[in-house]
Amino acid sequence: MGPTDQDWIGCAVSIACDEVLGVFQGLIKQISAEEITIVRAFRNGVPLRKQNAEVVLKCTDIRSIDLIEPAKQDLDGHTAPPPVVNKPTPVKLPHFSNILGKQQQLQLQQQQQQLQLQQQQKQQFQEQEREQDLPSTPRSRANDNGRVAAGGASSSSGPRGNFNSALSDKMHQLKLIETNGSNGTLRTPQTSRASSAQQQPQISTTPNSVAAFFGNMIPPKVEVKLGSYVSNTRESYCSSSGDSGEATGLSLGSSKPIDIVSNGDGFYKQTAASSYGNTNGNVRRNGNANNNGNGTGNGSYTNGNGNGNGKNKRNRVRRESSMRQQQVQLTFGSEADDPLIHEDFDFEGNLALFDKQAIWDDIESTTQKPDVVRHIVNNHHHKPEQKYRHDENILASKPLQLRQIESMFGGSQDFVTDDGLIIPTIPAYVRNKIEISADKAGLSLQRQIDILARGASDLAITLLGGARRLTPANNHQWPKIAIICDGGKNMRTINIGAATGRQLASHGLTVLLYVEQAKLLEQNSSSPEISLFKATDNVIVHSVDALPTPDLVILSTNTANLSDAIRKWLSVNRASVLAIDPPPCGINEVAIKYSILPILPLNGISTATTSSSSSAAATPTPIASTSAAASATKSAASTNNCGKLYLCNLGIPDKFYRDCGIKYKSPYGHKYVIPIHSKD
């Protein structure tokens, strides 16, 4: 009885196809009259990416099939020297993105050389067999005749009854695997292929599929099926618990060539090419091997039962290897025929998007102009985008009532705040009437003076630099302030000046109070404000010569004409002048820079020149240098005005405004002192 299809399963074959497919080598898994299925395949000497992949070749594409002979024994039972077997040379896996081109040409040349060498070796081997007159076997007869049919039937001659028995005897004679009881490893005594493969393992990063490995090299005629040897028992050619190290090595993509040795079932198994070892790359498999393949031992990295530490380590190594492969695939996984590589960059289209003429016009329009003009031009062309404030309502609301204060008296002049609210002026007698009405209701004149002095002191501290200058680290050069109370015929202006000096002294500033009318102080020695000012240990002087060089001068007077000595001293002095409730017409020959007013401004009040912007008047500028103050004094010496105006909130209720004929709503918001500007 001749050999059946099942007798060829497990045999190592070399299948030569047409020029397009090339030469395949592997183990026969399934064979029929129409097709043959091999596993652990090599194509043109290059191993497949996955060792558990199945390659199905149709008989119409196969030109010849050659059996790859294992090691054999002579008639005396001694192992003969192994013949030269045309096994695939270990080839380092190529970089798959560059697998086409010159590399393919080199592979084709290598394939042709291998085919020629294979034919020469086969002829030599056949001549040796004829000389020794060995009994023929199915494999030798197949080689003598030179070919095996594509359908799996043999074309050899001879008795078919002895063919199967001879094949079985030959398979049993080739069982050369010995079990080493001391360490549980598998060895082949007379071949050096397994040991050399263990000494030089080649482990490379592999793609996700066979198609990704070969790319365009596998034609569509070859069906590549990725078998799952874990779920399908029929496809598990590397089974049994004792072979867990081999399965692990195969799953990691070992590129070791096929070792052709047989077992009792007719399968050819590859010895472990790679296993988990120490950091220097040596292969370590310790333990005792038994018949069922289970291994035990101390310090074993891969054993049959799956030691807890070894199993966790293997799982961790698999996860890390999988993550590295995914990262490499994401980084370098672009195909060689990626259309983006061959797409040309449109330089002309990209250049057309750049408006060079507009850039040149902008450069030429500003390069030849002075810095001031260039700054104005840039601000004109590049206007900042108007944005909403964090507290501004973006929804439409009722129109803002800018005129919240309405006066029924004639001669009124309108001022505006920074928020655009209109502040009208009122006659002097109306303001006096409001003060008297509040005094009668309990808000005494002394309390009103104290609130006005508080607003004046806050404004003075801001003008002196505020937190930038009044710090403990700058205590050695704190400013000095001179308060001038001149020309007053009553104690009101003196009390305002004394209260302002007291509150400034409470901040640690040095204050000198100048009062020309010494007799007036003697007559009103019981004035509470004078007594409180003396308690601050500051000095009241009556001579201009006793005045130091101050950083700020505060005028508290209601007359437009000062004494000659004070005017001369002010003209020589370079300090800025802050006036508290000055006359509406200003002070003759005195350049007032700032003025603070109670309640509402009076009719006919004169402000600073129109050249000064409203934005600059909105925030008081600290006194930076005496030279700047001197230049400002000279420019404004010929004008009689009150400078920049500030309005102080005295806390008078709205009822007293209405009683005096003024429709009033507070314009102060969150401040006690607000700047006002001329509406014109």
Swiss-Prot record:
Which residues lie within the region annotated Required for P-body targeting and interaction with DCP1A? 1-101
Locations of Low complexity compositional bias? 277-304
What the entry lists under CDD domains is as follows: LSm16_N
Identify the Gene3D superfamilies for this entry: 2.30.30.100, YjeF N-terminal domain (3.40.50.10260)
Question: Could you give a single Gene Ontology term from the biological process aspect?
Answer: P-body assembly
User: Mind naming one GO cellular-component term on file for this protein?
Assistant: P-body
Describe the location of the YjeF N-terminal domain by residue ranges. Answer: 430-658
Q: Which UniProt keywords apply?
A: Cytoplasm, Phosphoprotein
Which residues does the UniProt record annotate as the domain DFDF?
Answer: 333-369
Q: Where is this region: Required for interaction with Me31B?
A: 331-440
Q: Where is this region: Disordered?
A: 73-95, 120-166, 181-205, 277-325
Which residues are annotated as modified residue Phosphothreonine in the UniProt record?
188
Residue stretches making up the Sm domain = 1-71
State the PROSITE patterns in the record: DFDF (PS51512), SM (PS52002), YJEF_N (PS51385)
Which InterPro entries does the record cross-reference, listed alphabetically? Answer: DFDF, FDF_dom, Lsm14-like_N, Lsm16_N, Sm, YjeF_N_dom, YjeF_N_dom_sf
The consequence of residue 44 to A is: Strongly reduced interaction with DCP1A, but no effect on P-body targeting
Instruction: List Phosphoserine occurrences by residue.
Output: 136
Main localization category: cytoplasm
Q: Where are the residues of the annotated region Required for interaction with DCP2?
A: 102-338
Query: Outcome of mutating residue 345 to A, per the record?
Result: Strongly reduced interaction with DDX6
How is the quaternary structure described?
Answer: Forms a complex with DCP1A, DCP2, Me31B/DDX6 and EDC4/HEDLS. Within this complex directly interacts with DCP1A, DCP2 and Me31B/DDX6. Homooligomer. Interacts with Gyf.
Q: Tell me its family.
A: Belongs to the EDC3 family.
What's this protein's name?
Answer: Enhancer of mRNA-decapping protein 3
Provide the species name.
Drosophila melanogaster (Fruit fly)
